[in-house]
UniProtKB/Swiss-Prot annotation:
Its EC number is 1.6.3.4. Optimum pH is 6.0-9.0. Below pH 6.0 the enzyme is reversibly inactivated, above pH 10.0 the enzyme is irreversibly inactivated. Disulfide bonds: none annotated. This is NADH oxidase. The gene is noxE. GO terms for molecular function: NADH dehydrogenase (ubiquinone) activity. FAD binds at residues 7-11, 32, 42, 79, 109-112, 131, 158, 282, 299-301, 427. It comes from Lactococcus lactis subsp. cremoris (strain MG1363). Keywords: FAD, Flavoprotein, NAD, Oxidation, Oxidoreductase, Redox-active center. Catalyzes the four-electron reduction of molecular oxygen to water. Active on beta-NADH, but not on alpha-NADH, beta-NADPH or alpha-NADPH. Under aerobic conditions, oxygen acts as the electron acceptor. Under anaerobic conditions, DCIP and MB can replace oxygen as the electron acceptor. It is an enzyme of class 1 (oxidoreductase). It comes from the Bacteria.
Length: 446
């Protein structure tokens, strides 16, 4: 069987690796428009902010390793058309050579693309997006310029907040804009997000929330020099757009069933409306256990799992995805936040009737006074069924990072907040208290 994979990042690589390791003997072709593969974009801000010296280790797979296993790798090759009826992929190389690859099974792993705000001046020099490695290189080069002193970041989600930190670490003045009233509004309720807002402000980042960009203006050399919002005009030397991503599904959007944002609709086997076409990662929908329906959640962790599921099903073993919770985390200037499932705001927007329980305590036992940080927790649950549908944690302690995984499993297994209240959680003073803050938050649920 011949399998063509379009896209060589997390989802495409996971699909190919699963096939190679579990179901050998197939002919595999991987195509990507970039010159590299397997770039961990989540590390861009860490590298650009000089928390690591070089970006080399942000790549975890090489073309030659796949080629050694018999895979045909076509990088710097742009797919122009897919003939789904005749099962053919049409592409063109960097040197304009035309390529036609027939397939028995096709895997679309084309990922997501930045949302480009349609504003006057959007094409000016000095306005950047941040997703691909080469975009990270461009921003890194801009940060190295002495004349680039004042940077505007539009969008205070994870990527925007992280690159704002990176710019500050490089000694820049940073203005962080978002139309919402807080940072991280897609993942956390306002009471939690404000903790990050305070952290950002304490580290010298100028916050402009509840502000909407309207226009970019240029200097005499054609570089962006001002950003105009609904409230004021600001002088800037560089703009980084981080307002979000949408599915990169143009190759198939008019032939396959799609979600409201253009993502390719798939079932729990990652199979599209065409039984010989699978879609994985950011280009596809995914089943949310919190929502109990298919939705769109673009995360690298989801991409890897969806690729594994697709690989098994293509290889001949029927395997259903168990669904996801959208578990995520962020660490900015030593302040850590993690969440999973739905926030109260998100749940209400989706029409769910929910309640929540908040609690705050020290991470370790009360008699340990050194390196014992406060932890805030919120558990979100359906009011009637009491099924847990979300959780949020915030602290300077890194221990919270592991705790969110327990809530992820609770959501997946449809556990109630009352069951959580009596869950056997270990106690050791170095790590927690006998009355664990997760236990107390659950016990306090009304």
């Amino acid at each position: 069987m011949k399998i063509v994979v379009i896209g060589t990042n997390h989802a495409g690589i996971a699909t190919a690796n699963t096939l190679l390791e579990q179901y050998p003997g197939h002919e595999i072709v991987m195509i990507d428009r970039n010159s590299n593969m397997s770039y961990l974009g989540c590390g861009t801000a860490i590298w650009v902010g000089r928390q690591i010296e070089k970006p080399d280790e942000l790549f975890y797979a090489k073309a030659e390793d796949f080629e050694a296993k018999g895979v045909k790798i076509l990088t710097e090759t742009e797919v122009s058309e897919i003939d789904f009826a005749n099962k053919k992929v049409y592409a063109k190389t960097k040197s304009d050579d035309e390529i036609i690859e027939a397939y028995d099974k096709l895997v679309l792993a084309t990922g997501s693309r930045p949302i480009i705000p349609n504003l006057p001046g959007k094409d000016l020099k000095g306005i950047h997006f941040l997703k691909l490695f080469q975009e990270g290189q461009a921003i890194d080069a801009e940060f190295a310029k002495e004349k680039v002193k004042r940077i505007a970041v539009i969008g205070a989600g994870y990527i925007g907040t992280e690159i704002a930190e990176a710019a500050k670490r490089r000694g820049k003045e940073v203005l962080l804009f978002d139309a919402e009233n807080t940072s991280l509004a897609s993942y956390y309720d306002e009471e939690f997000a404000k903790g990050m807002d305070e952290n950002l402000a304490q580290h010298g980042i100028e916050l402009h929330f509840g502000e909407l960009a309207k226009e970019f203006k240029a200097n005499e050399e054609g570089y962006v020099s001002q950003i105009v919002t609904n409230k004021a005009t600001y002088d800037v030397d560089l703009v980084i757009n981080c307002i979000g991503f949408t599915a990169n599904s143009a190759l198939a959007s008019d032939k396959l069933a799609t979600f409201k944002n253009g993502a390719i609709k798939v079932d729990k086997h990652q199979q599209s409306s065409d039984p010989d076409v699978y879609a994985v990662g950011d280009v596809a929908t995914i089943y949310s256990n919190a929502l109990q329906d298919f939705t769109y959640i673009a995360l690298a962790s989801n991409a890897v799992r969806s690729g594994i599921v697709a690989g098994h099903n293509i290889g001949g073993k029927e395997l259903e995805s168990v669904g996801v919770q959208g578990s995520n985390g962020i660490s900015i200037f030593g302040y850590n936040m993690t969440s999973t499932g739905l926030s109260v705001k998100a749940a209400k927007k989706l029409g769910l009737e929910v309640s929540f329980s908040d609690f705050e305590d020290k991470q370790k036992a009360w008699f340990l006074h050194e390196n014992n940080d406060s932890v805030k927790i919120r558990i979100v649950y359906e009011t009637k069924s009491r099924r847990i549908i979300g959780a949020q944690l915030a602290s300077k302690s890194e221990i919270i990072a592991g705790n969110i995984n327990m809530f992820s499993l609770a959501i997946q297994e449809k556990k109630t907040i009352d069951e959580l209240a009596l869950l056997d959680l270990f106690f050791l003073p170095h790590f927690n208290s006998p009355y664990n803050y997760m236990t107390v938050a659950a016990l306090n649920a009304k």
